[in-house]
Amino acid sequence: MIIKPRVRGFICVTTHPVGCEANVKEQIDYVTSHGPIANGPKKVLVIGASTGYGLAARISAAFGSGADTLGVFFERAGSETKPGTAGWYNSAAFEKFAAEKGLYARSINGDAFSDKVKQVTIDTIKQDLGKVDLVVYSLAAPRRTHPKTGETISSTLKPVGKAVTFRGLDTDKEVIREVSLEPATQEEIDGTVAVMGGEDWQMWIDALDEAGVLADGAKTTAFTYLGEQITHDIYWNGSIGEAKKDLDKKVLSIRDKLAAHGGDARVSVLKAVVTQASSAIPMMPLYLSLLFKVMKETGTHEGCIEQVYGLLKDSLYGATPHVDEEGRLRADYKELDPQVQDKVVAMWDKVTNENLYEMTDFAGYKTEFLRLFGFEIAGVDYDADVNPDVKIPGIIDTTV
């Protein structure tokens, strides 16, 4: 079938398998052209491995450090008449390119919050890898079924303690509009912490440790975003921020557990990028459109692969890591450069419907958004007939 982008709200409901493969290849080429990661990981588990930062971590470990990788994700395969999810095609492409390099790559499809998927992962590590020396936690999910209670909990994107009104960008209608959000209830805050906080990361590390599949010296990191003043009301000081603060608490006990075997645990702070998750946050499209313009002008613009490759090379496995006073690894320092933030803040209230394309890089934002789904990739013929039924040879599908 011939597949064209169809966007509804902050989701593109179609995906392009050839475009997704080309996007993965571009990221691999970036890593291989920038050289190996010295003393990098060799056997890596990535939880949330199919898109965005998790996919970039899997690519960086495999092609920057020659690592065998096991990826966990929750994606949907395509059929002859309907495309699958982008994460499915990304993972199929990753496994194909890893196999060409002689690297081990297997994937587990299922609910990473569940005990079942944790057990299947442990069994696969024991059978295929023995032990892992890096665990990357990169889950973004709107809800979680708690494995112990069976309760399904939802996360909420709301301010805490006060209603907030801010400028946003309606990406469908391409207009600037005021957005007002009522404060989260305590139940909504607790739910967001349960879905997006550190409990599941801790459950993973506890399960892996008890099963004896963490190598001596094993490291783990969970990805987070802090942002700057302009996003704080809705992000760091909001319900999501409460979940992110929970990561900062949970990492301490995880670090103690791994330190007993010479290992380490860190929260890693990454810059704002276009992802399916960030495009759902009302103020992020406008912030990102301004940020892209400023960072491209200063030559510091980065996407997922540049961020995560740099994180592994400089901080997780580098001699002089970028660490803040909380002990987090920082890869967001170019975004938080005061000169960059001052320019974004200065333009924030000046953007109008009429000057949107001149004052911001909304065009670049839209391109990055479509690239998530395999569109707008250079060299791909989007008028060609493609088969959306793409297999992942090494898949262990717990959903069937």
From Swiss-Prot:
User: Which pathway does the database say it acts in?
Assistant: Lipid metabolism; fatty acid biosynthesis
Question: Which InterPro entries does this entry report, sorted A to Z?
Answer: Eno_Rdtase_FAD-bd_dom, Enoyl-CoA_Rdtase_cat_dom, FabV-like_NADH_b, Trans-2-enoyl-CoA_reductase
Write the signal peptide boundaries: none
Q: Name one GO biological process term.
A: fatty acid biosynthetic process
Assigned EC number: 1.3.1.9
Per UniProt, the keywords (alphabetical) are: Fatty acid biosynthesis, Fatty acid metabolism, Lipid biosynthesis, Lipid metabolism, NAD, Oxidoreductase
Sites where the protein binds NAD(+): 48-53, 74-75, 111-112, 139-140, 244, 273-275
- Known role: Involved in the final reduction of the elongation cycle of fatty acid synthesis (FAS II). Catalyzes the reduction of a carbon-carbon double bond in an enoyl moiety that is covalently linked to an acyl carrier protein (ACP).
Name of the protein described by the UniProt record: Enoyl-[acyl-carrier-protein] reductase [NADH]
**What is the originating organism of this protein?**
Burkholderia cenocepacia (strain HI2424)
Its organism's taxonomic lineage begins at: Bacteria, Pseudomonadati, Pseudomonadota, Betaproteobacteria, Burkholderiales
